[in-house]
Amino acid sequence: MAGHVSEAVIRRLPGYYRHLRELEAAGVTQISSQELGERMHQTSSQIRQDINCFGGFGRQGYGYNVSELKEHIGEILGLRQKHSVIILGAGSIGTAVARYPTFSREGFETIAMFDIAPEKVGTELCGVPVLPMDALEDFLREHPVDIAVLALPARVAQETLNRLDLCGITAVWNFAPTDLTHPEHMIVVNVHLSDSLQILSYRMAHRGETEH
């Protein structure tokens, strides 16, 4: 596998994996870079360049074996490993993440949720216990956790991230509407839901304009 891969390539990998999974489910066994590019609205050369970053998986005159390429990309994405997950915040976003079925199929197991609301603490969401926020440190001392999902208001997100850092958590999926300051050893992926909506709004406002 290549040592350095650009952020742009990394961001495209989940799309490849998703489309290949759909093709496999539809019974498609092989696909060319041109066909995959048309499906993903990318050029065939871009497809080949991205995939070649990790080795040659295609064959001249044949293209790609759909199942094999899906498995290779899944391995590159780390999807062969099991990851234990906690969700901080049992509101709308936290609950939606807990209920999303694909995560468990891809090896992401939510083992606990945390919240401050008395009416939520002590209940279960999708079979996952909701614990009080002040039990976070004790829980992390007793349970190995790979990923923490922050589904909290911006005003408490940084403080909570700092608590996670002190507990040894090094991977955070942040849905709080703010970018967080974090140490270099911690991987934080920010998901700003409004960004996608604003991009959609821009494209609607400029529909039909020719790019120069």
What is the role of each PLM region?
Residues 30, 34, 39-82:
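HTH-adjacent hinge/linker in prokaryotic transcriptional regulators
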